[in-house]
Amino acid sequence: MKKLALFALLMVPAILLASGHDSGEASRYLTQTGRESDFWPRVINFTIFAAILYYLIANPIKNFFKGRREGIAGQLKEIESKLQAAKDEKKEAQSHLNESVNKAAEIIEDAKKEAEILAAKIAEASENELVVLEKQFEEKITLEERKAARDVIDEVLSENITTDDIALDETKVVDIISRKAEHGKVA
C-alpha cells in the first residue's frame, strides 16, 4: 500500500507536467535554465518534500498506531481477564450450589432419620405407658376383688354370726361362706 501511494505521488505530477503548454512559457523556461522542461527539478523537489513530510509525520503516525494497537491489546487483555474472572466465579457459584444441594439432601435425610427415631421413641413410650396402665388396671381389679371379697366376708360374718355362734369352728365358717358364694354375692 505504501509503495502504491509513493508511486502515485511520483506519477501524478509527471502526468500533469506532460500535458501541453503554450510555447511561450516553454521558451521562457528554456532561456532561464537552459532546459526545455522543469520535470526533473520538480521530481527532485517533490521527492525532497515527500522525504521531509515522511520524516516529520512517520514517527507520530507510527506511534499513534502503535499506541492504538497497544490500547486495543490492553483492552482485550482486560476483557479476557474479566471473562476468566466471571468464569471462575461461575464455577465457584456452581460448586457452592452443588454443595448446598448436597447439604440440603443430607439435612432432609437426617430429619427423616430423626423423625423415625422420634416416632420409635414415642411408640415405645406409648407401649410402656400402656403396659403400666394395664398393670395398674389389673392391680386395681385385684384390689377391688379383694375389697369386694372382704365386704362380702364382713357382710356374711355380720349377718350370720350371732351371739350364739361365737364359738365357731372352721367348718362352720367355710359352710357360711360357701352358702353366700352360691347365692352369687361373691364375685
UniProtKB/Swiss-Prot annotation:
One of its GO terms (molecular function) is proton-transporting ATP synthase activity, rotational mechanism. The chain crosses the membrane at residues 4-24. It is a single-pass membrane protein. Keywords: ATP synthesis, Cell inner membrane, Cell membrane, CF(0), Hydrogen ion transport, Ion transport, Membrane, Transmembrane, Transmembrane helix, Transport. One of its GO terms (cellular component) is plasma membrane. It is found in: Cell inner membrane. Signal peptide: none annotated. HAMAP family: ATP_synth_b_bprime. F-type ATPases have 2 components, F(1) - the catalytic core - and F(0) - the membrane proton channel. F(1) has five subunits: alpha(3), beta(3), gamma(1), delta(1), epsilon(1). F(0) has three main subunits: a(1), b(2) and c(10-14). The alpha and beta chains form an alternating ring which encloses part of the gamma chain. F(1) is attached to F(0) by a central stalk formed by the gamma and epsilon chains, while a peripheral stalk is formed by the delta and b chains. F(1)F(0) ATP synthase produces ATP from ADP in the presence of a proton or sodium gradient. F-type ATPases consist of two structural domains, F(1) containing the extramembraneous catalytic core and F(0) containing the membrane proton channel, linked together by a central stalk and a peripheral stalk. During catalysis, ATP synthesis in the catalytic domain of F(1) is coupled via a rotary mechanism of the central stalk subunits to proton translocation. Component of the F(0) channel, it forms part of the peripheral stalk, linking F(1) to F(0). Belongs to the ATPase B chain family. This is ATP synthase subunit b. It comes from Sulfurovum sp. (strain NBC37-1). The lineage of its organism: Bacteria, Pseudomonadati, Campylobacterota, Epsilonproteobacteria, Campylobacterales. The gene is atpF.
